[in-house]
Regions:
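Extracytoplasmic/periplasmic substrate-binding proteins
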Residues: 481-564, 570, 578, 588, ...
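Hinge/lid segment of periplasmic solute-binding proteins
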Residues: 380-428, 519-535
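Extracytoplasmic/periplasmic solute-binding protein
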Residues: 413-427, 434-479, 489-507
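C-terminal capping/gating helix-and-loop segments adjacent to ligand/active sites or protein-protein/ligand interfaces
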Residues: 602-681
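Conserved N-terminal structural module of periplasmic/extracytoplasmic solute-binding proteins
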Residues: 18-52, 57-70, 74-77, 119, ...
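C-terminal motif of bacterial Sec signal peptides marking the signal peptidase cleavage site
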Residues: 13-16
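Short, solvent-exposed loop/beta-turn-alpha elements that line the ligand-binding surface or hinge
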Residues: 395-403, 457-476, 530-537
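Short helices/loops that flank or line small-molecule/ion binding pockets
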Residues: 156, 358-376, 483, 487-512, ...
Length: 687
């Protein structure tokens, strides 16, 4: 078990609780510090529940199945004040899952807790039971919940011992039961979005006819209403003093009708998608269990967040802070930053989005100039070009990894200032007898996609001329292309006798493995075999482009993050199935997965089964199966073909798109379109 790492969050909080209606204010300043610790529990199975008192924290976990015949029984662990972990031996005689835990006694003499678990009865029906246990795992009492099992099937979100019985948070109400498992009442009804409780108090967040509210279960009254549903719809916990709210992936402090932002989960290294469960200790400490993946080798942590009193010494190990900025930061980037932060002892990355409108672009440019950010992110290479002069030379950024061939070759064209953690492939087809592809998108995407495939023929940059005959052919191709999403469905499109022009974006190997319908006949189709008789181009679309800002005082730390992005550990866990990784070993892992012909276990512990998927379109079946050796060889050969990075939009490309779209929308004639393109583009080329 790794040692707890403590770091100081330079964050603030106000005290008190006020009127009934609460609004969320992300600009309101807070004034009391918070500290956060993290405990590495990666050696435990995925956590399903937690509770704790002054002596121990109790954890419920559910092992991952590694064999179809393996029986999965819940596991219970205890962590003491010295972070020593002990597994308790509880008499689980049936397979099942623990959904919630609750501390019962927090006295210094004896620690007891309760757990609520679900299992299958002998007749195959679902059964629920509460076990009351001591600190060694000895079961003092079992309580059958047969009477309310149907109500619990909709979901169980929390358990709290109180006044000799229990509160159970279900999906549509909070139930009160006695010590024998008999239902006493529905304490409150409505959609339950969050639940928390200690012996000091119990509350829930609910959505009812009166709106979104925090409800005190002991006093049976609304504490306050919440105005902005968007900000509180994903509540994880509510400390029992009612002055703190953990919801919408942020911690808020409530005072006088306003909830002030204290910190976002990302600030302490957690992405909301990683959070498994949350609980509150009697002293108000929040525990958040987070895991960065679903496989056996995923990292797992418990984050411990505390309020620091005004006179307390909050000095801890302060981390080096890096700021990653961008106009719009992608989900992949946010997950990468959260995963990186979870494993770091000395470095913390925070993210700042400036927006993609004109004002946001200006603010981002000023932040670069003023040295306010260390790392720059963009989803698209062309958006990074304008900031190239602000970025460090990263020509050595790929020297330490075995990189897949198309990325290595394409990067020589992109320059030396960018790091790309993964990529997708785009395949362009002009109209031809074999070019039957299904196109996603409307006029603008059609023009955009085909123009990159054709523009080198249409425009003669050296002689500053436009080939109007090729331009006319391009316009005709685009005009005749079916707009699949607007006018037709997949079966009708595939049954059409008319050749279909299109562009396909290859995000993962499964995109190659289709058996599609042409007419009513099922035929093999893979995105790389059926080249059209016209031009054929492969281009790499980067999945995230990163750069180190020139002048950053933490260049070494920034480089470490970029090495992490392109390294084996991160890429093998996160690349598939969203995109092709740049790391060769990570790519090989994908080949092992998609070509499996029998159940097997990869060296990293991943269970692999032969892949097969069936999808029905209007009674027509599309089947995807595992790749055979020949298909796999074809894909590898296709990936080794010469590739170029998806280019920056040049001004003349935008002009052509603009005029062609006007023609497609019947705003002008074909002859006028050819004339306008010729004139406008010639002026740009002359400049």
């Amino acid at each position: 078990m790794k040692k707890i790492i403590i770091f100081l969050l330079s964050l603030f909080v106000l005290t008190g609780c006020g009127r009934k209606e609460v609004t969320f204010d992300t600009t309101k300043e807070v004034t009391t510090a918070y500290t956060s610790e993290k405990l590495d529990v990666s050696d435990l199975p995925p956590i399903t529940g937690m509770c704790g008192d002054e002596q121990y924290v109790y954890i419920a976990a559910s092992p991952l199945r590694t064999d179809e015949k393996q029986k999965i029984y819940p596991e219970i662990y205890r962590i003491d004040k010295n972070n020593e972990v002990k597994q308790l031996s509880l008499p689980f005689e049936k397979e099942g899952t623990v959904y919630a835990l609750s501390n019962i006694s927090s006295s210094n003499e004896k620690s007891t807790f309760a757990l609520l678990w679900r299992y299958q009865d002998q007749d195959g029906t679902a059964a629920y039971q509460i076990m009351i246990c001591d600190e060694e795992g000895n079961v003092d009492q079992t309580i059958s919940l047969q009477e309310i099992s149907e109500e619990l099937e909709a979901g169980v979100f929390g358990l709290q011992a109180f006044d000799g019985g229990f509160y159970i948070a279900g999906a549509n109400s909070v139930l009160s039961i006695d010590q024998n498992g008999k239902k006493k009442e529905d304490v409150c009804q409505g959609m339950i979005l969050g639940f928390t409780g200690t012996e000091n108090g119990i509350a829930c967040l609910r959505l009812s006819e009166s709106g979104m509210s925090v409800y005190d279960l002991n006093e049976k009254k609304i504490i306050y209403l919440l105005e902005d549903r968007e900000e509180n719809g994903d509540m994880r916990a509510l400390p029992s003093d009612h002055t703190l709210l953990l919801c919408a992936n942020k911690l808020w402090h409530v005072e006088n009708g306003t909830a002030a932002l204290v910190f976002a989960l990302g600030d302490i290294g957690i992405n909301s998608e990683m959070v498994q469960t949350v609980c509150e200790l009697p002293d108000g400490t929040l525990l958040l269990a987070a895991r960065d993946g679903l496989d056996m080798n995923a990292n797992q942590w418990i984050y411990i967040c505390r309020v620091a009193g005004k006179n307390e010494n909050t000095e801890g190990l302060k981390k080096t802070e890096l700021v990653l900025g961008g106009g719009s930061i992608s989900r992949e980037c946010k997950l990468a930053v959260a995963a990186y932060n979870m494993q770091q002892d000395k470095v913390q990355i925070t993210m700042k989005e400036y927006g993609t409108d004109e004002a946001g672009v200006k603010q981002l440019s000023m932040a670069l100039t003023d040295g306010e950010i260390d790392l720059l992110f963009s989803s698209y290479l062309q958006d990074m070009e304008q900031y190239q002069g602000s970025l460090e030379d990263l020509s050595g950024g790929y020297e330490n990894i075995a990189m897949t061939k198309p990325v290595r070759e394409a990067l020589t064209e992109a320059g030396s200032r960018y790091v790309i953690p993964g990529f997708r492939m785009r395949t362009f087809y002009k109209r031809g007898d074999n070019g039957k592809l299904y196109l996603y998108g409307g006029k603008e995407e059609v023009c955009d996609s085909f123009l990159y495939a054709d523009v080198k023929g249409i425009l003669d940059e050296e002689n500053k001329k436009v080939d109007t005959n090729l331009l006319k052919e391009y316009i005709k191709t685009v005009e005749e292309m079916p707009e699949a999403e607007e006018n037709t469905s997949l079966p009708e499109l595939l049954k059409s006798d008319k050749p279909i022009c299109g562009v396909t974006e290859i995000s993962e190997p499964n995109d190659y493995m289709g058996i599609y319908l042409m007419g009513e006949q099922a035929v093999d189709y893979t995105g790389f075999e059926q080249k059209s008789s016209g031009q054929y181009v492969n281009e790499i679309v980067p999945v995230g482009v990163y750069g180190i800002v020139h002048g950053s005082k933490q260049e070494e730390e920034c480089a470490d993050f970029l090495y992490y992005l392109t390294g084996e550990e991160y890429q093998m866990k996160n690349a598939y199935p969203d995109y092709f990784p740049v790391n060769e070993k990570a790519q090989q892992r994908i080949w092992d997965i998609v070509s499996a012909t029998k159940e097997t276990t990869l060296p990293d512990g991943t269970q692999v089964n032969p892949y097969r998927c069936e999808v029905t379109y209007n009674d027509y079946e599309v089947v995807v199966e595992a790749l055979d050796h020949e298909q796999l060889h074809s894909i590898k050969a296709w990936l080794d073909m010469p590739c170029v990075l998806y280019p920056q939009k040049k001004k003349y490309v935008e002009l052509i798109e603009e005029e062609v779209i006007k023609y497609l929308e019947k705003q002008q004639s074909l002859s006028d379109t050819l004339e306008y393109v010729d004139k406008r583009v010639s002026i740009v080329l002359a400049e």
